[in-house]
Curated annotation (Swiss-Prot):
Source organism: Haemophilus influenzae (strain PittGG)
Protein name, entry field: Phospho-N-acetylmuramoyl-pentapeptide-transferase
PANTHER family hit by this protein: PHOSPHO-N-ACETYLMURAMOYL-PENTAPEPTIDE-TRANSFERASE, PHOSPHO-N-ACETYLMURAMOYL-PENTAPEPTIDE-TRANSFERASE HOMOLOG
Primary location group: membrane
Enzyme's top EC category: transferase
Location(s), subcellular: Cell inner membrane
Gene: mraY
Catalytic reaction equation(s): UDP-N-acetyl-alpha-D-muramoyl-L-alanyl-gamma-D-glutamyl-meso-2,6-diaminopimeloyl-D-alanyl-D-alanine + di-trans,octa-cis-undecaprenyl phosphate = di-trans,octa-cis-undecaprenyl diphospho-N-acetyl-alpha-D-muramoyl-L-alanyl-D-glutamyl-meso-2,6-diaminopimeloyl-D-alanyl-D-alanine + UMP
Residues spanning the membrane: 21-41, 73-93, 94-114, 132-152, 168-188, 199-219, 239-259, 263-283, 288-308, 338-358
Record carries keyword Lyase: no
Amino acid sequence: MLVWLAEYLVRYETAFNAISYITVRAILALLTALFISLWIGPKVIKRLQILKFGQEVRNDGPESHFAKKGTPTMGGVMILFSIGVSTLLWANLANPYIWVCLFVLFGYGAIGFVDDFRKITRKNTDGLIARWKYFWMSVVALVAILWLYWLGHDTDATRLVIPFFKDIMPQLGLFYIVLSYFVIVGTGNAVNLTDGLDGLAIMPTALVAGAFALIAWATGNVNFAEYLHIPYIKYSSEVVVFCTAIVGASLGFLWFNTYPAQVFMGDVGSLALGGALGVVAILVRQEFLLVIMGGVFVVEALSVILQVGSYKLRKQRIFRMAPIHHHFELKGWPEPRVIIRFWIISLMLVLMGLVTLKLR
């Protein structure tokens, strides 16, 4: 939005031309989202306490989690607000990719909001019925995907980039829709499953979003895209602003969510952030890199799938409890140790993912 204002004001003061640079707006988006989160955080927490929007805890979970019962939840609304305001302020709103990102972010946020609200009003951990939850997640994902397919079905925007192989970039055609669906819905659920300990999901989210900001910038720069042997995507450079807004909002939320947490993001935050990461990966054609850099999310989701599958087939559990972070808790690891070690792993995976861009 401010890009348009700057274009007008530059006639009177050339300094406003700085706002036209994507790097400047990306940094400002990060700082804006960060400061908004820090500013509204205490107000949101207080309001959630007044409304008695407290966390419900599984009866079969680790005993240490019983103390978390009643901690304000649905703090994800402050994340969404911070990202939304920052993106609308600093992004070029003529870019269709920005609207696709915001659509998925707030679409999944709305689904998570309803899910959280039902848990709170029912005083248990049962939210939306699973089939309805997946139905609405699918609707949001498919609308976004068809929108993107219409924008770029005959360009590099629908090619599949494979790490380490610079000359293998097949045109996906209609399979683009299928792959994109699983990326968005899968990432939304994976981040949601990871959000079980204080700060566990939000830091990897910030790290992955920061990495995608760099990738989006390179993908939207024809010279760097050619140098790295990745597709040049016309609209992708503006996604940098959206990604840095996620980083800023995530760090601001972490201020209140770090152990011991003052607030939880709830499904309204985790589903929205997961969906946002998924759609960004699709926009910059780096679905495989999402699997690498978001490895913590992948392992958390796989641990649940394996646990459920093993119990149904063999009546035996692989882990003491799933998702896998609870397994380590039940082994005796203190919660902060689990969190920090998962953060370290996430940082290593993000760096590995970035390195693959050059190893081609």
